[in-house]
Amino acid sequence: MYAIIKNGGKQYKVKEDEVVKLEKFDLGIGEKVEFDTVLMGQTAAGEVKIGAPTVAGAKVVGEVVEQGRHKKVKIMKFRRRKHSMKQQGHRQYFTAVKVSSISL
């Protein structure tokens, strides 16, 4: 059983009892979160439901387990023949959610 949800302009494939790192949102650790924008899902019986654009009445419930930052991504701009370069780093914030139930 799985579902494809939309969060923060991105799509994520989630399964029950799986921890997923999503875009950061302001909730404390241990709080419940509910996603209503389920784009597609598969039931335990194997039936696939596709939304247009979302599956009606479907929702994914999870619990926040961690707030953190990803590893650093280095951005480097190099100007050829000028002996000049610029280096910059970025660490994106995330919220880790453990999916507790999927209902389609």
Curated annotation (Swiss-Prot):
GO terms for cellular component: cytoplasm; ribonucleoprotein complex; ribosome. NCBIfam families: L21 (TIGR00061). Belongs to the bacterial ribosomal protein bL21 family. It comes from Francisella tularensis subsp. tularensis (strain SCHU S4 / Schu 4). This is Large ribosomal subunit protein bL21. Part of the 50S ribosomal subunit. Contacts protein L20. This protein binds to 23S rRNA in the presence of protein L20. GO terms for biological process: translation. Pfam families: Ribosomal_L21p. Keywords: Ribonucleoprotein, Ribosomal protein, RNA-binding, rRNA-binding. GO terms for molecular function: rRNA binding; structural constituent of ribosome. InterPro entries: bL21-like (IPR028909), bL21-like_sf (IPR036164), Ribosomal_bL21 (IPR001787), Ribosomal_bL21_CS (IPR018258).
